[in-house]
């Protein structure tokens, strides 16, 4: 059996909500893929003036993405730097904490449960793209190739950069760790250079966590929001492979028009976006992945 269904599963799971300064919608669709391996988080007003959203695109199985979806916010809230409002350090440490938890006996047991009782070794991993809004500041932490794009002055302001093995710095680290890059893949296998999970690439005891073939360490971008910032678009790579960033923002803006922004409207727009991106067939290769998108609208901007 190949990676694709004979017909796409266009059923969507959509959630929307509203907080003090944010209206959001999240929608996910399995699409052409045999399985759904995406996960995401969305919490408005986790604390006063603080909201958090995230996309986790699984590979090699759904289990790591679902594990991170379950534990990320809980671990972030426990983090001392989070309590001290040192959000960049808190996000960085929480990304790394996910790998630590996966290595514990409890973590391994939970992975088996997510897999439906299959106790064979898991080779799964996931990307992580997490947006934290605090007052008028946005932090985006990224490991992998899920993305966040800010609609600023009606143009795209990219909040993350893909981590691909062909990137010079990433490739240099992979080679220092004893690996190689072939056809844009680490050791000819994984087409990401940073991810959560993928523990078989992180087992060299002589190397630190940020020196392994694959690392969970995120890049973090911080920006002060202003009156020209309208919304943040987040998504797994399947959302970004068909249209460029500017065209994606244009699609959303046209759908929003001059209507009053409500959670229900954003939910419909998110679903329309996925319907627009899915391929009519699998011949081209793009538009055939699982798709998850979040649209986070900034009130008063």
Curated annotation (Swiss-Prot):
Transmembrane segments: none annotated. It catalyses: O-phospho-L-seryl-[protein] + H2O = L-seryl-[protein] + phosphate; O-phospho-L-threonyl-[protein] + H2O = L-threonyl-[protein] + phosphate. Residues 1-18 have a biased composition (Polar residues). GO terms for cellular component: membrane. Its EC number is 3.1.3.16. Mn(2+) 2 binds at residues 57, 237, 289. Keywords: Hydrolase, Magnesium, Manganese, Membrane, Metal-binding, Protein phosphatase. SUPFAM superfamilies: PP2C-like. Its cofactor is Mg(2+); Mn(2+). It is found in: Membrane. Binds 2 magnesium or manganese ions per subunit. Mn(2+) 1 binds at residues 57-58. Residues 23-298 form the PPM-type phosphatase domain. GO terms for molecular function: metal ion binding; protein serine/threonine phosphatase activity. GO terms for biological process: signal transduction. Enzyme with a broad specificity. Belongs to the PP2C family. This is Probable protein phosphatase 2C 4. It comes from Paramecium tetraurelia.
